[in-house]
């Protein structure tokens, strides 16, 4: 009797365990799977790491003030970057870039074939266009000049303003020095106009920068010179060329005939920081700075 009771208890226990196992299994099969908690997507724009390091630029005195304005804006956004902008002229800029003495050279003209032959890895980055105005002392009022007349004046063939509709006064020519990008562009666009290759008169008063040219013309009677649009102000008189006023808008619409590219030059692909600076120059913000005095390329 005792053995039978013990058997009943064992069977009852086994039945209870079986029912529990079945219940747990069903719960596991029918339970809704739970997903790991997810974070709300960020609405903030990813931020780029600020740049750091130093850049050196040298060359064209036309590009120099523009490059300085661009450098100031870039350094304001990247306080760990230092950019040194020097002058020296376009030829110096090209040579310095080719010899790797600067990160970026500056040239206010096209690069010469001879320069590409000497430095075959040069890469040219055009950042703007610039007009070249023909300016006179404030007392000299000219209704306009043709390119042919400008060519003859700077060649020393026309020597009196009365020959081009001005007052009876001897002309004193002011020019940039050899190696200047502004001079190189002027020689290409004006002195070689029409298939002729005339030389600038040896009597010209040579100056080493656009700023110096402007000062001499503003302060010296009966002078005439060529000057970057970026240096035009009320101190000198720009003459219309071929009937077109010397204005940025007229370069942009291709009616003003004397203009040239403003270039930055690297020896091969630019380094990382130089590329970042060039990218900034070509951005909407950089080109807005260009547009203050020059013609943007974007």
What do the predicted segments below correspond to?
Residues 21-25:
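C-terminal motif of bacterial Sec signal peptides marking the signal peptidase cleavage site
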Residues 27-298:
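Exported/periplasmic ABC-transporter solute-binding proteins
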Residues 11-19:
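Hydrophobic helical h-region of N-terminal Sec-dependent signal peptides
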Residues 2-11:
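Bacterial N-terminal signal peptides that target proteins for export
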């Amino acid at each position: 009797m005792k053995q039978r009771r013990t058997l009943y208890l064992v069977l009852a226990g086994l039945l209870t365990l079986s029912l529990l196992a079945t219940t747990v299994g069903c719960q596991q099969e029918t339970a809704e799977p739970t997903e790991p908690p997810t974070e709300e997507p960020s609405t903030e724009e990813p931020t780029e790491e600020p740049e750091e390091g130093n850049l050196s630029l040298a060359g064209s005195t036309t590009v120099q003030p523009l490059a300085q304005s661009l450098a100031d804006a870039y350094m304001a956004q990247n306080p760990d970057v230092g950019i040194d902008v020097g002058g020296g002229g376009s030829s110096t800029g090209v040579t310095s870039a080719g010899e790797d003495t600067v990160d970026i050279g500056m040239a206010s003209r096209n690069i010469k074939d001879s320069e590409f032959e000497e430095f075959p890895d040069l890469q040219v980055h055009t950042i703007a266009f610039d007009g070249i105005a023909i300016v006179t002392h404030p007392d000299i009022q000219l209704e306009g000049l043709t390119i042919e007349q400008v060519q003859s004046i700077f060649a020393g063939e026309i020597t009196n303003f009365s020959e081009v509709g001005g007052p009876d006064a001897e002309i004193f020519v002011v020019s940039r020095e050899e190696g200047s990008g502004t001079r190189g562009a002027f020689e290409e666009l004006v002195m070689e106009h029409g298939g002729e290759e005339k030389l600038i008169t040896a009597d010209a008063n040579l100056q080493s920068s656009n700023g110096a040219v402007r000062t001499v013309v503003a302060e010296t009677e009966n002078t005439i010179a060529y000057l970057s649009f970026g240096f035009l102000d009320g101190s000198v008189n720009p003459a219309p060329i071929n009937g077109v006023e010397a204005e940025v808008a007229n370069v942009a619409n291709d009616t003003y005939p004397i203009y040239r590219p403003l270039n930055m030059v690297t020896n091969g692909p630019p380094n990382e920081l130089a590329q970042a600076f060039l990218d900034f120059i070509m951005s909407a913000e950089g080109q807005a700075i260009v547009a203050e005095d020059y013609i943007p390329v974007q």
